Amino acid sequence: MRPSYLGKILLHWCDTCHVPVLSDVCGCGAATRKVGITPPGDARPAFPADCELVNRIFEDHFGAPLIPPGTIALLNKAPDTDRMEEIIMGGCVVGAIRYITGEKRWEPLPRPEAALFLRPARRYVVVDEGAVPSIRDQGASVLAPGLRVIDPSVRKGDEVFILSPDGSCVGVGRAKMDAGEASAMERGAVVRTRKNAPSRCVPGQSTWEDAVRANSSVIEETEAEAVRFVQEVAGNTERPANISYSGGKDSLATLLVVKKALGNVPLLFIDTGLEFPETLENVAVAAETYGLEVIRASGEDAFWDAFERLGPPAMDYRWCCSACKLHPVRRLIEERWGECLSFIGQRRYESFRRKESNRVFRNGIVKNQISAAPIHNWTALHVWLYLFREQAPWNPLYAQGLDRIGCFMCPSSDVAVIGEIQEKYPDLWQEWSARLGVWQEAHGLPPEWVTEAQWRIRGGVCDETYRYC
């Protein structure tokens, strides 16, 4: 799938501090270097649950975890049929993990730089010294005459590390046959080497507190621009202001910016009845922490009424946002203020649609609301560094491996994420699955429409750039 270019990729790395930096100069004064990641380049911190997932995948496959304790790692979502995450450590992409929906499993995709952080205990091959230059420098395949050792666990299609006789990594690739067959071969290709451009990688230990210090000037400048924007927009209208709060990281960052710009303004929360329990708790915690009123609109009844008529929402049939969010908030605004100014946590790096959106706009359905996006040009890393600096109460779901917070059964969720939600929230998912089952039987749909989450796409194809409401 083609990458989406939604803005300049800002990720750099400081080899002195061993941290990501969002400018060409680190807070320590050292020059930084660009990190080559796949667009849109909205990299985010790898939280403990993320690190556990990556390490489990690599340990299951190669017999060794990838992310060492005390090492900062980031994840960058890359375009794929379901979910693929690039893993960034030491200032470069050291590999990726990809979810294979048909097999319901994760696959590791290492790059040679991964060998700076792990030594494979299985699924590796060792080649003759004479074969090293062509494999390392030209990306040549591993041929049978140059094969010295192949780990017995290697099966056709496996990702493998290619090692020199001294144990250093000279490449990575995919096995073209089982180990037994390869050992008996006298000629032919054993491993198809994957060509990856060499990247500078400097391992080192650091913390996110170090990263906040390294980015202090960037965060201050970014915050100051957002505060000025809020003050300017609010100064140009007499409409009462509020903060559209969802319980996610972006709306929390927006809350902080608006509070610094305008003081206390109320939170506007749309309770669809489909939120995670942690999200509802976060709304309460944020309101209490910052002394803000919460004004609520409810869309739960509207969702189930529409479900009975339309079936489940899908990525290419997003009736849910208008039914459960836009129409309820329009009615609430009309009753409470008539018209209002809402500051929202919308960012251009989230989707093509949001990139094309103006920073100040009106929604076609909620015409009595002016929306303004103070953090429109922030990346996810800007947001997280800001929240870390402010010690803000962010939603604990992020620490559990979710990268975006919304309705628990959002059709924009990847199948990989849906599997995690089913496991962690069986009661929520059991009710949803039962509703899907009734619709499936009533319309003569196959069982896999439910079991393989085919309900998420009505037409069978969906443009990934439009996955966000």
Which ranges hold each PLM region?
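RNA-binding accessory domains that recognize and position tRNA/RNA substrates
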Residues: 1-244, 252-266, 272-275, 282, ...
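Nucleotide-activated chemistry modules centered on ATP-dependent adenylation/adenylyltransferase
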Residues: 2-13, 18, 31, 149-150, ...
